[in-house]
Structure formats: C-alpha cells, structure tokens
C-alpha cells in the first residue's frame, strides 16, 4: 500500500521573506507538516491491525486520527502551492469574475476572508472553496484541519491560522500575519484549482 509522503516545496524556505520567515517555513514544513504525514501513515497501519482483530473501538479511534492527520497533510500540501515569492496582486480572468459575482468585489472578498481567518477560535484555517452542488464560491472557517468544511467543497485557497504558522514572527498579532499573507498568494495556483473544480467535478455529489 502506498504511503503518504511529504511534498517538496517549489521555493526555498526563505523565499517568502519578509512576509513569512524562513525559520517559520522550515519548521512548518519539515516538522509540523511532516508530523501529519507520519500520523496519517501510522493511523493507516493501526487501522489494518484493528481490522484484522475486528477491534471496532480501535478502528473508530484510528479512523478519527486518520481524518485529523490526513486533513492536516492535505491542507498543508495545498497551502504550500497557494504561496509564491512572486505572488500577491489580484486574480484575473474567470476567477476574478467569479469572486466579484460571489462577493461583490475583490475587496469585499478579501475583507470576508480576512475576517474568517482572524476570528478562528483556537486552531484552524480560512478557506475559499468551490461548492460543487451549488456551483458557487464560498468561504469557511475550518476548525482544526477538517471540521466545519462540508463534503463536496473543493478547496481553492487556504490560510493556515494555527499558531505554528505565524507565532515565531508575528507573536500574538495574527491580524498582521493575515494581512501579510496577501503579498504571497499564488493566484495562478488558485486559478488552476478553480478551473479544475469547475470543469472536472460535475456529478461528484449527485450523478
């Protein structure tokens, strides 16, 4: 059975400075993300053992652990692709039009996304996703890595608001981190995800 693996980054750890420090990116990728990858692989192995023993309490526990760690792995894999040293500015083309249609303007979208990020209670994410059932863009607060994000929503843009993503540089002023994020958003990646979500997910929920 194939194992989950830690992805390589498209840029050096220090490439997002001064907006996100190299120290944060190195720890975030090589330690925190790596821990979720290991946790997901460990949960899969323990699930196999529990199923062989027909130990349903252990099965449920490890399914829960897998959901948490695999979601952490998935979210971070998107997170790294959503960032670029050549990022910033605004989206263009179909994504820009869809954002304006859904939120009224890019500035209104940005304000709503910023509010979602900075008011997360505890650990979580802000997420822009494509609703494959309603055919529209939506913003969600994601609690931990997987809660409050409905099935059928395709993540396009994520902002990690766990303290490990910003505390070494921004301390408790997470609002400044959320503002700095816009300087390194890789809109080309978000546009690519939007194009795939709107063209390849029809019938995903209801055939």
UniProtKB/Swiss-Prot annotation:
Its cofactor is Fe(3+). GO terms for cellular component: cytosol; extracellular region; periplasmic space; plasma membrane. Its EC number is 1.15.1.1. There is a cross-link at residue 202 (Isoglutamyl lysine isopeptide (Lys-Gln) (interchain with Q-Cter in protein Pup)). Keywords: Iron, Isopeptide bond, Metal-binding, Oxidoreductase, Secreted, Ubl conjugation. PROSITE patterns: SOD_MN. It catalyses: 2 superoxide + 2 H(+) = H2O2 + O2. Binds 1 Fe(3+) cation per subunit. Fe(3+) binds at residues 28, 76, 160, 164. Its main location: secreted. The keyword Ubl conjugation applies. The keyword Cell cycle does not apply. SUPFAM superfamilies: Fe,Mn superoxide dismutase (SOD), C-terminal domain, Fe,Mn superoxide dismutase (SOD), N-terminal domain. Pfam families: Sod_Fe_C (PF02777), Sod_Fe_N (PF00081). GO terms for biological process: detoxification; response to oxidative stress. Destroys superoxide anion radicals which are normally produced within the cells and which are toxic to biological systems. Belongs to the iron/manganese superoxide dismutase family. This is Superoxide dismutase [Fe]. The gene is sodB.
């Amino acid at each position: 059975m194939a194992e989950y693996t830690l992805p390589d980054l498209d840029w050096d750890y220090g490439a997002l400075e001064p907006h996100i420090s190299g120290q944060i990116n190195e720890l975030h990728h090589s330690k925190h993300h790596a821990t979720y990858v290991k946790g997901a692989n460990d949960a899969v192995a323990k699930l196999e053992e529990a199923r062989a023993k027909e130990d349903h309490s252990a099965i449920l526990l490890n399914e829960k652990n897998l959901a948490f760690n695999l979601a952490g792995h998935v979210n971070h894999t998107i997170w790294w692709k959503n960032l670029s040293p050549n990022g910033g500015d605004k989206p263009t083309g179909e994504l820009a039009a869809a954002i304006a249609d859904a939120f009224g303007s890019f500035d209104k979208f940005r304000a709503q996304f910023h509010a979602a990020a900075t008011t997360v209670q505890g650990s979580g994410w802000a997420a822009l996703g494509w609703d494959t059932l309603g055919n529209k863009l939506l913003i969600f607060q994601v609690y931990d890595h997987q809660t409050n994000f409905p099935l059928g929503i395709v993540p396009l843009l994520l902002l990690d608001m766990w303290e490990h993503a910003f505390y070494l540089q921004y301390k408790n002023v997470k609002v400044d981190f959320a503002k700095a994020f816009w300087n390194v958003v890789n809109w080309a990646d978000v546009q690519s995800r939007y194009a795939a979500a709107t063209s390849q997910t029809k019938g995903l929920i209801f055939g």
